[in-house]
Amino acid sequence: MAGGRPRPPRGFRDFPPEVMILRKRLLSRLERVFESYGFDPLDTPAVEYWETLSGKYGEEAESRLIWRFQDPWSGRWYALRYDLTVPLARFVASNPGLPMPFKRYHIGKVWRHEEPQKGRYREFVQCDADIVGSPYPEADAEIVSLAVDSIDALGLPGFRVRVNDRRLLAGVFEEELGFDNPLPIYRAIDKLDKIGVEGVRRELERLGLPGSTVERIMEIISWRGRPGEVLESVRRGYGSNEKVREALDHLEEMLSLADDKRVELDMSLVRGLDYYTGPILEVVLDEPRIGSVAGGGRYDGLVGMFAGRDIPATGVSIGIERIIDAGLELGVYSLDVKTVAQVAVVVLDRRYYRYAWEAARILRRGGLNVRIDLSRASGQVQRRKASRLGIPVLAFVGAKEAEGGFLTLYSAAKGERVAVPLGEAVKAVERLLPS
């Protein structure tokens, strides 16, 4: 603090009411989309045993990005959730009686020891939807369709859905370059958006690959376009490879269902986490360029690491933090709404406060959000506070209102003032509210 105002740690944020109102509105839209596909809500602890997360994400995440700590009493190591997928896998393994396929959505905070920058924080909310128990392309198609519908519901213009398949790349690399372990290559390629083409080239060279091999990799990952065209080209060149053939058949069936002009096949897409095994996807905005706003894919081996048997799974994570940042920058979202209150009961005469209190109770029971003076301020001050917060309807209570059993309602936006009996006040307020 050092003499200044107290503030949260670097990479962590406070969300004042106007921000939380926007966040809640957007998250409720996502919940509606998830539930429209029949996904059920789930929550898991913010803290997991370290051994639950260890060995699931890859070296960089586990050595640098996961927040972990030791219990000073038991000596056992714990970690904050790095994502919502590994906890899901642990949950499924812990509950073997779940009906399959198990479709869940989970909206919750995760923590990563990232270097804070635009669109990247150390504490943020993920919005995940996953299908556990189906190995078929239909499940992956539903995930792609859900991702498209989610971004549409959030009102963002100009986005693309990039898809690929880990097996497709593995098979092409196997045929072209003889790789039997492409994971180090994937990790280098995954940095393309962060470090650019030349940066990836240098990363590949650091792996000790010959220059000709590096150039061939760079050429392969430049293949992108309409899925049908790219897949047909790959089938002609590498269709004899078993991994390529499996991936092509799966992708073609998946994309025949999830048919959207915004979907493209991009061979540079690998997704950095080690647990992906098949189709993968990312959603990127045309503007602003802030990285992916959603991503996911198939991870058929992860649940089995806990359950001791193969259980297929696929899913997507929507990055609400980047979406909000992008929407504010584009002007799609605003922070104009400062309060959830729809009505301010303005008490003009303290002698009739009990009547004002009863009026507020009736309005609340009618489903309205109501504020009433709690600081014994003058009527003028109450009006000023309500105006500053942007509360759309004022309900005045003075001697004539209390003695006559009515309220005087006023809407500045509509320029309308009306006196209504207390029993009709709810409907009258609803008519005055902005549509």
Swiss-Prot record:
Catalytic activity: tRNA(His) + L-histidine + ATP = L-histidyl-tRNA(His) + AMP + diphosphate + H(+)
Annotated Pfam families: HGTP_anticodon, tRNA-synt_His
One GO cellular component, as annotated: cytosol
Any single biological process term in GO: histidyl-tRNA aminoacylation
Organism: Aeropyrum pernix (strain ATCC 700893 / DSM 11879 / JCM 9820 / NBRC 100138 / K1)
Name of the molecule in the record: Histidine--tRNA ligase
Main location: cytoplasm
GO MF entries: ATP binding; histidine-tRNA ligase activity; RNA binding
Record-linked SUPFAM superfamilies: Class II aaRS ABD-related (SSF52954), Class II aaRS and biotin synthetases (SSF55681)
EC number, as in UniProt: 6.1.1.21
